[in-house]
Every structure is written in C-alpha cells, then in structure tokens.
Amino acid sequence: MSLTLESLNQKNTRSLKAVQTEVESINRIALSVDCVIFGFDENKLKVLLIRSDLRKFQSKWSLLGDLIHINEDLEAAAYRILKQRTGLSDVYLEQVQTFGSINRHPAGRVVTVAYCSLINIQHHKLNIFDNELHWHDINNVTDLAFDHQQIFDTCYRRLQKRIQEHPLGFNLLPKKFSLRELQNLYEAILGTKMDRRNFRKKFFAMDFLIDLGEIEQDVPHRPGKLYKFNYGKYEKKKKKWVGIDF
C-alpha cells in the first residue's frame, strides 16, 4: 500500500507534548547576557568593566552580565542588566554573537549572548552601586573573568569593522568638531596611526562634512576649522555608500 504525502508528513513529525517532554528531560542550560559598552573620552577608546562578584574570579574585572529571567526576551534582559549595573538606559545595544563553550562558566552550562554599544562618556552618568565600576583603556584590558576576554575581543573587532561601514563615530564628537578630533577618534578605535592628508582626502570625498566657517578656540595647537556632519545628506546616500577603506 502506497503512503500518501500527508501520512508521510504525519509519520515524520512529533507532537508538541513529545517535544516538551524531551526539553524537560534534558539537563538544564542557563542563558545569560553580557554587555560590552565602549566609550570615547580624552582621545581614548575605553570599555566599561565591573569587578566580578564570583569568589572564583575575585579581584578580576568582567563585563556587565547576568542570567536572563524565564519570562524575559533577550533584548529586554540586556537593557535590564545594563540599567541595574550602571544606571544607563538611553543607549542603543546591538546583538553581536552567542558564546557557548562547554566550560565557559564554572557554575555549569551557561550560554551567553553578547550585546555591544558605543557611547560618548561625557553624555552619560554612571550610577556606582556595590561593585566597582570603571572605564578602562582598551589597551590595558587583559585577563578578564570567565571567557570575557574572548567576548571583548570579538566585540572590539566588530566595532572596528562597523565604524568603517557606517559613520558611527560622529555621535561621539561635539556637534562642532575639527578634522584633528575626527582623526583622533578613528585612530583610537582602529588602533592605528593614519596619514593626515590621506585621511582628510577620504572624508572630503564623501561630501558629508559641512564647513561652518569657524575655527577652534583656546586650543594648545594651531586652531583648525570646525565642521559638522551632514546627517541629511548621509540618509539620502547611505544605501549606495560602501563605507571608508582605510
């Protein structure tokens, strides 16, 4: 007797109850969220770290993270954890990657999802609670708790790629900025020195800078012209914009 397509489909499928029973019988796996918050201040790229409250990692720094609640979406958990640990609420978090090495957490099987953000430190005030919370120069970040060094490195590489694909950096600058400040920002994030003439040539070619006809005031170096970013022009051209190749 030949089987119909419908009967074959029924034979190869499982009921919801069967799947539910299987899920309940599997060893529990916890899910957490870790937030990597980058900030720019004093021409340096920094990352926000908190002292680990786990005895095994006593005195080590860690990212901002915690387990998610059973009735909570991933993104909601990320914003809740960030708010609880830092007081920050008006930042944009972008999901980066999932980390699930078997032995990444000493308490058991914990899979974590990393979120990343880039903010202007001067525009955000931190609330310091029981744990130490500090901005650290990214060049001094080593030996973090758990697998947080790997998570940090991954998010940093993602940030370096993103800032060449999108003009994220302008949100970190004053509304009026000099080309010197702009170059300092990109050098800090990309971790490399750039040729001054070539850098300026690339940005002028994009035609997203507006010359304000003003110069810097009270600076210890030769005053430079002040510019602002033309967000309106960028919005019109962003679909065709291929980024900046340094």
Question: Which ranges hold each PLM region?
Answer:
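Active-site segment of metal-dependent pyrophosphate-handling enzymes
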Residues: 29-33, 75-79, 83-126, 162-169, ...
